[in-house]
Amino acid sequence: MSTDVSTLIDRYVRDIPDYPQPGVVFKDITPLLSHPTALRTAIDALAEPLLGSEIDLVAGLEARGFIFAAPVAVRLGAGFVPLRKAGKLPAETLAESYDLEYGTATVEMHADAVPPGSRVLIVDDVLATGGTGRAAVDLIRRAGGTVVGLSVLLELGFLKGREKLADVELRALATV
């Protein structure tokens, strides 16, 4: 990815120690979100490598992945699918549980959100342990979709989340 984008992320993503629990260093993207040029640059950088690709849907992971996934979907001419925390969707759902850096969780989507054969890009803000990404990939595939890749703003390389996603094309705008 461009050095400019990586530098921008380094400048506008701050570390919050011991959040949400002691020992975790949380990557706070809110400074990037409040800076219009930084936000636009990040969204463009997530979308541009895939312009002209056959992508039917962009799936965004709750909550911060939504911020990037919806505008990426618009840029790619694709629909948007929210992947939500358990119990947040009103219709019948498919669910996948996973481990994350600081606990366990479940991700859900509407059972009819991904028609079989759909080509789906997954977008999130940060790749940490890879648990959330792995659950999203498995969920999309279980619905009959084809995962064309996983794109993230920031990869925490030291947590080795990429290893859980060896079967998926992974794009990170920056790695720390």
Curated annotation (Swiss-Prot):
The keyword Lipoprotein does not apply. GO terms for cellular component: cytoplasm. It is found in: Cytoplasm. It holds the Pfam family Pribosyltran. Its EC number is 2.4.2.7. GO terms for molecular function: adenine binding; adenine phosphoribosyltransferase activity; AMP binding. It comes from the Bacteria. It catalyses: AMP + diphosphate = 5-phospho-alpha-D-ribose 1-diphosphate + adenine. The keyword Cell wall biogenesis/degradation does not apply. Pathway: Purine metabolism; AMP biosynthesis via salvage pathway; AMP from adenine: step 1/1. It is an enzyme of class 2 (transferase). NCBIfam families: apt, PRK02304.1-3, PRK02304.1-5. Catalyzes a salvage reaction resulting in the formation of AMP, that is energically less costly than de novo synthesis. Homodimer. Belongs to the purine/pyrimidine phosphoribosyltransferase family. This is Adenine phosphoribosyltransferase. The lineage of its organism: Bacteria, Bacillati, Actinomycetota, Actinomycetes, Streptosporangiales.
